[in-house]
């Protein structure tokens, strides 16, 4: 029996504690909150895309505030420079040498707010940090502290003053989610209660960074059967043959799908993945990685195509 099987109750308790803590700030969005926590535990990064005012930043801040760790927020603007993210080397005349001054990327959780308002050059400065979990300044590599997660928010690209994220950067995000507008009951609770800013000020951490790292280790140990791995490869191969898709899913996408499946299984108290885990996370993991043919560039089309792939690819039969 693996560690996660032996401590499934403890894992689920910690997971639910974090989700519940965030839900005290972000009302009526439990599914989105669970995805955010799963992204952290799968050692991935999260992209939250939606219109202004629906709680993107509040969700990111609440996740960071629910963990006893370091976190930084960067407001992306057109004049933001790469050095504003990674840091700079400062010459100290007293000892005649350069000293590295770390930028805000040197935190466990980094909130990149409105990432698509910065220039492509600045957006690209995130790539090494997100992929390699280290950055290079003046030829020297600096390792980022674990756990490390980037939570980026962006407004729809149709809005004025936004830059479309390149495919290479989108591919670095494990999950992309949208919060959407709250339901009527949830919006009434928002009106009746405190504002998110007030709730964030009193929010207390419910897990330590050491507990998060232990949960990350448990997620890594979730078992994926060969038949389930074949099922995920079948989905990727089907995307490469689809007539509406210009560029199908890469092997990296399949790896990211497997990571999300492990996190989803662990969050539900299991030490093994199932096809239902694949179906639960597929849209959030895969839709932003598809490059559609001309005339099929709406986000909803990408979501629908992932659902179509899931419907068309046979599910492995348990034996």
Please identify what each model-predicted range represents.
Residues 1-5, 9, 241-319:
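C-terminal engagement/docking regions of AAA+ P-loop ATPases
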Residues 8-54:
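Pre-Walker A (pre-P-loop) alpha-helix and adjacent loop at the N terminus of AAA/AAA+ ATPase modules
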Residues 34-38, 91-111, 140:
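Conserved alpha-helical scaffold flanking the Walker A/P-loop in AAA+ ATPase domains
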Residues 37-77:
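Walker A/P-loop
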Residues 50, 113-114, 125:
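Walker B catalytic acidic pair
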Residues 66-94:
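AAA+/P-loop NTPase substrate/partner-engagement loops
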């Amino acid at each position: 029996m693996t560690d996660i099987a032996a401590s499934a109750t403890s894992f689920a308790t910690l997971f639910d504690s974090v989700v519940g803590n965030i839900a005290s700030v972000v009302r009526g969005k439990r599914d989105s909150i669970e995805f955010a926590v799963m992204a952290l535990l799968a050692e991935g990064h999260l992209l939250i895309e939606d219109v202004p005012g629906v709680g993107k930043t509040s969700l990111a801040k609440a996740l960071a505030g629910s963990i006893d760790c370091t976190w930084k927020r960067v407001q992306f603007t057109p004049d933001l420079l790469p050095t504003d993210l990674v840091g700079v080397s400062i010459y100290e005349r007293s000892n005649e040498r350069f000293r590295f001054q770390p930028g805000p990327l040197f935190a466990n959780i980094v909130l990149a707010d409105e990432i698509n308002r910065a220039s492509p050059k600045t957006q690209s400065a995130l790539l090494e940090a997100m992929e390699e979990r280290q950055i290079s300044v003046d030829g020297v590599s600096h390792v980022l502290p674990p756990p490390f997660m980037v939570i980026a928010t962006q407004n729809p690209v149709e809005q004025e003053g936004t830059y479309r994220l390149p495919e290479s950067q989108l591919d670095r995000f494990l999950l992309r989610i949208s919060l959407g507008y709250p339901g009527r009951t949830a919006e009434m609770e928002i009106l009746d209660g405190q504002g998110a800013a007030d709730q964030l000020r009193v929010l207390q951490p419910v897990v330590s960074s050491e507990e998060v790292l232990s949960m990350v280790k448990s997620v890594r140990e979730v078992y994926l059967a060969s038949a389930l791995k074949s099922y995920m490869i079948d989905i990727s191969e089907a995307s490469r043959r689809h007539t509406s898709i210009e560029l199908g899913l890469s092997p990296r996408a399949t790896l990211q799908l497997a990571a999300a499946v492990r996190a989803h299984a662990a969050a539900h108290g299991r030490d093994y993945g199932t096809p239902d885990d694949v179906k639960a996370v597929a849209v959030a993991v895969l839709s932003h990685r598809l490059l559609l043919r001309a005339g099929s560039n709406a986000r909803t089309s990408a979501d629908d195509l992932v659902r179509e792939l899931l419907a068309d690819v046979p599910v492995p039969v348990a034996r």
